[in-house]
Amino acid sequence: MRHGKAGRKLNRTSSHRKAMFANMAASLIEHEQIVTTLPKAKELRPIVEKLVTLGKRGDLHARRQAIAAIRSETLVRRLFDTLAPRYASRNGGYTRIMKAGFRHGDNAAMAVIEFVDRDPSVKGAADRARVEAEAANEEAEAA
């Protein structure tokens, strides 16, 4: 009997699960919206909600806990400086999960997980900056 055994294993080892959710949380903080399978989105939600709550606390210990969880100081800075103030007046419920049909290859249920009141201009901003930098670099080499 599996009484009291919360959480999905997702057919992965515990270290793989931990790394995967750290990467997914980092991607969600960076892009504010990601597409994944429905079970992964449902498991990711409490992890990200706790990270935003750490950001709202804002002290040094909370910052170090967030760095330990997502392993990226730049994303922790974004979490504490932009996301936490945005949700300062909201008590939980920082993310939303929307069902997004089924994946063609294996018919897995897909979902979009995003921050409530997200900034749409953030999605793809890193890619735009990279493309602009490459174009500027090519122009400099051509000159």
Curated annotation (Swiss-Prot):
GO CC list: cytosolic large ribosomal subunit
Domain of life where this protein originates: Bacteria
UniProt entry keywords in alphabetical sequence: Ribonucleoprotein, Ribosomal protein
Single GO biological process annotation from the record: translation
MF terms in GO: structural constituent of ribosome
SUPFAM superfamilies per the UniProt record, alphabetical: Prokaryotic ribosomal protein L17
Oligomeric and partner information: Part of the 50S ribosomal subunit. Contacts protein L32.
Similarity section: Belongs to the bacterial ribosomal protein bL17 family.
Protein name: Large ribosomal subunit protein bL17
Organism from which the protein derives: Chelativorans sp. (strain BNC1)
Taxonomy of the source species: Bacteria, Pseudomonadati, Pseudomonadota, Alphaproteobacteria, Hyphomicrobiales
